[in-house]
C-alpha cells in the first residue's frame, strides 16, 4: 500500500479479534514513523471503569509499536456510550494524552442520529469525526444531516463505509438506470 501512495492506516483494539494492531505494526515497521498516518480507537463499549483507559491505551501503543497515534477515536459513539463516557471522563483522559504528544488529532466515530451528533459536537472540542457516508446512507441514516452538522462546526470528516462493506460496489441494473437517469454524465 505504501508503495502505491496509501499512507493512512486504520486499526482498532477489537479488529480481527485483537490481532489487527499487531498486524499493522508488523506491516509498517520497515517504514519511518513519520511516513504514514496511524488511526486507532478506544473500544468505548468495553469500558467499565476509568482505570481501563490507561491499560488499553498503553496496550495499543505496545501492540502498534508506534510511540504515538496520528488519529485517535472514541470508537462507535452513540447516545448510551456517550453518556457513559462522560462519567468515565474518557474525553479528558484522551485530551491529556494529546497534550502529552501521544495523540496528534482527537476525534470519534459515530453511529446514531443527527440529534445525538449535535449534542456531542456542542459539548467538546474535536479535531475530526468519522461517519458512515455513502449514497445509500445519505438519506436512510441521515448522513447528509450528520455531514452538515460537522461541516458547520468546522470539524473535518473522515468517511467510513463509502461502499457499505462492499455491498455498493456492484449495483443492480435498476440502480444503475436510476443513477444514470439522475446524472447521465
What are these regions (language model features)?
Residues 12-21, 45-51, 80-83, 114, ...:
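Acidic-and-aromatic substrate-binding clefts and catalytic sites of carbohydrate-active enzymes
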Residues 77-185:
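Beta/alpha (TIM)-barrel catalytic core signal, keyed to glycine-rich beta->alpha loops juxtaposed to Asp/Glu
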Residues 61-82:
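Active-site groove signature of glycoside hydrolases
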Residues 1, 49-65, 111-121:
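Short, acidic/polar
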Amino acid at each position: 500500500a505504501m508503495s502505491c501512495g496509501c499512507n493512512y492506516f486504520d486499526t482498532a483494539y477489537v479488529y480481527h479479534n485483537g490481532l489487527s494492531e499487531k498486524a499493522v505494526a508488523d506491516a509498517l515497521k520497515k517504514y519511518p514513523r513519520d511516513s504514514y498516518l496511524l488511526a486507532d480507537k478506544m473500544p468505548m463499549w468495553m469500558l467499565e471503569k476509568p482505570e481501563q483507559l490507561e491499560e488499553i491505551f498503553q496496550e495499543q501503543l505496545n501492540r502498534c509499536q508506534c510511540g504515538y497515534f496520528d488519529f485517535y477515536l472514541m470508537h462507535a459513539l452513540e447516545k448510551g456510550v456517550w453518556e457513559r463516557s462522560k462519567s468515565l471522563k474518557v474525553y479528558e483522559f484522551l485530551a491529556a494524552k494529546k497534550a502529552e504528544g501521544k495523540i496528534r488529532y482527537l476525534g470519534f466515530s459515530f453511529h446514531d442520529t443527527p440529534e445525538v451528533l449535535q449534542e456531542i459536537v456542542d459539548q467538546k472540542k474535536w479535531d475530526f469525526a468519522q461517519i458512515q457516508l455513502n449514497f445509500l446512507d445519505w438519506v436512510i441514516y441521515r448522513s447528509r444531516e450528520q455531514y452538515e452538522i460537522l461541516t458547520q462546526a468546522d470539524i473535518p470528516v473522515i468517511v467510513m463505509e463509502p461502499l457499505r462493506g462492499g455491498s455498493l460496489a456492484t449495483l443492480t441494473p435498476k440502480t444503475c438506470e436510476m443513477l444514470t437517469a439522475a446524472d447521465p454524465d
